[in-house]
Amino acid sequence: MSSIPLHLVTGFLGSGKTTFLKNYLEEFSGSRKIGIIQNEFSNVNVDSFELQQNKSGFEILEVNNGSVFCVCLLGSSVDSLDSFINQVQPDELVMEASGMSDPLSIGQILQSPKLKHKVYLDHVWCLVDAVNFKKITRLQTRVNHQIRIADTLIINKTDLAEDENDELVYLIKKLNPFAGIQLATFARVSFDLNKPVMKLWPSKENVENGRPDLESQVIKSNRLISANNLNEFLKVIQSGCIRSKGYINLTSGAKVLLQGIFDQFTLQEVEKFVAPTEFVVIGSFPEAQSYQKLFDNCCSK
């Protein structure tokens, strides 16, 4: 089985993720077999019932209680997803994350032995509620984190906040200047994945012999790293790296957003990021190579 692309759909509660999924299915489910993974935080999954009313060309795996993104249930989530892929054999996967989820945790799932050769993260969509964004972003730092790692940001419900749309675009660009931004009503957008400034993956046409054999490693640390040592770390990983993204705390006190495609890396200082270092590196790695250990060693120099 070829490696399957996974599209991750994030956004706070009520931002329009399920409506976006409906639109996505209307666009593509007639031409490809789509596996839908819903990561609901409640015990009863209402959204999957809503989606199934228009079922055509897709299957649903209900993952309740936020289990896909919960480290304590990581094993069972991997088994469920692996079984789902084997049974359904979809052309692609679309995961709707719960509104309370931290999207980077998906990297821990995809790097599991059962999945790392079957699934790769293709694109991260984040829906932003134009009406309630200012209230939510003050209360939930996780919302800002969802915005920061997105490839495409969809500012939804713009018809209900017309006077604030320009300001919202400005505020969101401050959080993530690299993502493509689309203004939408009822989550209707263009699905042209070539529009984002920093697309998560190279286009299929640029990959020889089909999709690459890719893995992902999530690096986490409570320690600080100097700018010089970080540059040395990036030089080491660049040969096997296709995509890197996340946040790093420096010894200078600065917090930087790492964005990388192949051997090209950018580091941008960010404000209001209060969390340990956490970033994902995706690519083809030598066996048993641990970027976590390498990063830890660079922190201790």
Regions found by a protein language model. Name each.
Residues 26, 144-145:
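Alpha-helical segments flanking ligand/cofactor-binding loops in enzyme cores
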Residues 281:
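Flexible loop/N-cap segments at domain edges
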Residues 2, 43, 145-275, 285-289, ...:
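C-terminal accessory "lid"/substrate-recognition subdomains
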Residues 2-10, 15-136:
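Nucleotide-state-sensitive switch-loop elements of NTP-binding domains
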Residues 138-141:
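Charged helix-capping and loop-helix junction motifs
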